[in-house]
A protein has these predicted regions:
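Sequence-structural signature of the catalytic-core scaffold of metal-dependent phosphohydrolases
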Residues: 2-38, 67, 103-199, 207-458, ...
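Terminal helices and disordered tails flanking the catalytic cores of nucleotide-processing hydrolases
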Residues: 2-21, 25, 32, 371, ...
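Sterile Alpha Motif
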Residues: 27-58, 63-64, 73-112
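Alpha-helical interaction elements in eukaryotic regulators
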Residues: 44-48, 58-62, 72, 80, ...
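Eukaryotic short linear interaction motifs
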Residues: 73-75, 84-86, 94, 321, ...
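Charge-dense, low-complexity polyampholytic segments
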Residues: 100, 186-189, 478, 533
Length: 619
């Protein structure tokens, strides 16, 4: 019998208006009586026996054995377990008929899956339990948090949000784990495993704050410098709050999940081991045993950074930024398998894909240089951070029990944090509260494009690490040039210093050194491939620092003076020469010898005669 057409649900519509078929879960209170009747996964033993009778396999002795065994509809999710139970309960002559009946029932109910039309992955099927999670205030909150934060102020197409990215990651997580199940049945990947991995992918970004990484990367370190907080921690807390406040525990059980064990597994995929001291143990996780260690490398791969989260944001961000994406995750899906190394199972990639993986990390680096760390996008985020910092004491958010929280403390209460989105930008901008005037003025400058002026960027010439702190602005204010000094006196508060760490995802390490490969000759054996085995044209270093300096003033004379301060500061600190150094401060750059030494190849080129002079027949 052919399967009924699935529902196509658009993301643009409000979740309450999404088209639903009869039998799909309705509302936040759990399955209705109608969905109990139509969705076989929610059937109890008696309802299952009634269906067997309708199929013509309702002999009293068979039904009695089914009732005694306690088989329920949730077992239909896991075909191997279902077949095992049928083999145990049924007589040999009955087994084929019963299995055929139950399998047909499974096939008839693919309409329970919802279909979303995603601009990146096309028409994708989403499990009804994931739809129940999506249709909650905690998940819908992600519609109002920009994926790329302040980058949207520079790239007009980068208007996408954490909402669609999270759905994409949930989908890709399911694609990868299903591909592994089909390719390697011996891994014993169950339907429970698949569902938990999909939920972890879907919920991995629930904890992001306003403007995504601006909140945890700039605002929180500035307002609460002693707090060691990560958005992954908030994602775990928000996931717990989502399940509890929407009473989804019973729904999870109805789809075959074992609540405590699978909740732990989902949270561990998002935030790592629940017990931090457990990291010292040989196996720190509670949700799954060591035999399924590879499942922890799908959503957030702590070992080498190759995970479905990156696969989605590479494709999605490039699409919206208008930047070419040279990495195709679909090819990697076909060449990923599991191998055992030192008593643990890890995701491995075919050896011939090593070049594509270098391309993947190169794509990541290019995205950071061209978009994520754009000099204008960054200064806009710095200005928004300043505005939020000035508004922090006066902006109140109501949490559980009526308690009020600030912007910087809202993540302590998930009810308050649910209300904290990019919308606070507009609330401050359009407020009439006198206490918010300073914050409002900064946001008005952003709206009028009266941004802090970019003076230039530089890098440390040696391998030393520059730590971002207030002393950097003080040192640049003390670097007034002695040769032809400008008339303007500048102070530390006139400067903004932004220190950016660029890398391939693992600081100074080569992430490919952490990747395991397999060869065609023996797909079960994992090997490593060194950089030297791939190409001599690959990067020699995998991390660098970029130091950008801005001036808060809009006055042309002040900006001109600030650029000279900046050049003098680079000379004193032994940093590289800014690209426009010879233009903005031609009287200063000759003072540093290393800035004016041409390389040997430049000397040779200057010394060689031109082609016209060398050719004897050209007279």
């Amino acid at each position: 019998m052919g399967s009924p057409a699935a529902v196509v649900a658009g993301w643009g519509a409000a979740p309450a208006k999404r088209a639903r078929r009869e039998g799909s879960p309705e509302g936040p209170r759990g399955p209705t009586a109608e969905s109990d009747r139509c969705d076989p996964r929610l059937w109890d033993t008696e309802r299952l026996c009634q269906h067997l009778s309708c199929c013509g396999v309702g002999e009293p002795s068979l039904l009695r054995r089914f009732r005694e065994s306690g088989v329920t509809g949730s077992m239909l999710l896991d075909l191997p377990a279902c077949a095992l139970e049928v083999t145990r309960v049924c007589l040999p002559a009955e087994r084929l008929k019963v299995l055929a009946c139950l399998n047909k029932l499974r096939q008839q109910h693919v309409d329970v899956m919802k279909v979303f039309n995603d601009p990146i992955h096309g028409h994708i099927e989403i499990h009804p339990l994931l739809v129940r999670i999506i249709d909650t205030p905690q998940f819908q909150r992600l519609r109002y948090i920009k994926q790329l934060g302040g980058t949207y102020f520079v790239f007009p197409g980068a208007s996408h949000n954490r909402f669609e990215h999270s759905i994409g990651v949930g989908y890709l997580a399911g694609c990868l784990v299903r591909a592994l199940k089909e390719r390697q049945p011996e891994l014993d990947i169950t339907q429970r495993d698949i569902l938990c991995v999909e939920i972890a992918g879907l919920c991995h970004d629930l904890g992001h704050g306003p403007f995504s990484h601006m909140f945890d990367g700039r605002f929180i370190p500035l307002t609460r410098p002693d707090l060691k907080w990560k958005h992954e921690t908030a994602s775990v807390e928000m996931f717990e709050h989502l399940i509890a406040s929407n009473k989804l525990e019973e729904v999870m059980k109805s789809y075959g999940l074992v609540l405590e064990e699978d909740m732990n597994f989902i949270k561990e995929q998002i935030g790592g081991p629940i017990d931090e001291t457990a990291c010292e143990k040989s196996w720190p996780y509670r949700g799954r045993q060591k035999e399924k260690s590879f499942l922890y490398e799908i959503v957030a791969n702590k070992r080498n950074g190759i995970d479905v989260d990156k696969w989605d944001y590479f494709a999605r961000d490039c699409h919206h930024l208008g930047i070419q994406n040279n990495f195709d995750y679909k090819r990697l899906l076909k060449f990923t398998r599991v191998c055992e190394v030192k008593n643990q199972k890890h995701l491995c990639t075919r050896d011939k894909e090593v070049g594509n993986l270098y391309d993947m990390f190169h794509t990541r680096n290019c995205l950071h240089r061209r978009a994520y760390q754009h000099k204008i996008g960054n200064i806009i985020e710095i200005m928004i951070t300043e505005a939020f910092q000035k508004a922090d004491k006066f902006f109140k958010i109501e949490g559980s029990g009526g308690k009020l929280y600030q912007i910087s403390t809202a993540m302590e209460d998930m009810e308050a944090y649910t209300k904290l989105t990019d919308n606070i930008y507009l609330e401050i901008l359009h407020s009439s509260c006198p206490e918010l005037k300073e914050a409002r003025d900064i946001l008005h400058k952003i709206e009028r494009r009266q941004l802090y002026k970019f003076l230039g960027e530089t890098q440390p010439e040696t391998m030393r690490q520059i730590v971002k702190n207030n002393s950097l602005a003080e040192s640049i204010a003390n670097s007034k040039p002695e040769k032809d000094p400008p008339d303007v006196e500048l102070k530390a508060e006139d400067f903004i210093i932004d220190v950016i760490n660029m890398d391939y995802g693992m600081k100074e390490q080569n992430p490919i050194d952490k990747v395991l490969f397999y060869c065609k000759a023996d797909p079960s054996k994992a090997v490593k491939i060194s950089k030297e085995q791939v190409s001599k044209l690959l990067p020699m270093t995998f991390a660098e620092q970029v130091i950008r300096v801005y001036c808060k003033s809009q006055d042309p004379d002040t900006i001109s003076a600030a650029k000279q301060y900046f050049i003098q500061w680079c000379i004193e600190k032994d940093f590289t020469k800014p690209q426009d150094g010879d233009v903005v401060a031609p009287h200063l750059t000759p003072m540093k010898k290393s800035w004016n030494n041409m390389r040997d190849d430049e000397h040779r080129t200057a010394a060689e005669p031109s082609c016209k002079q060398r050719l004897p027949f050209d007279k």
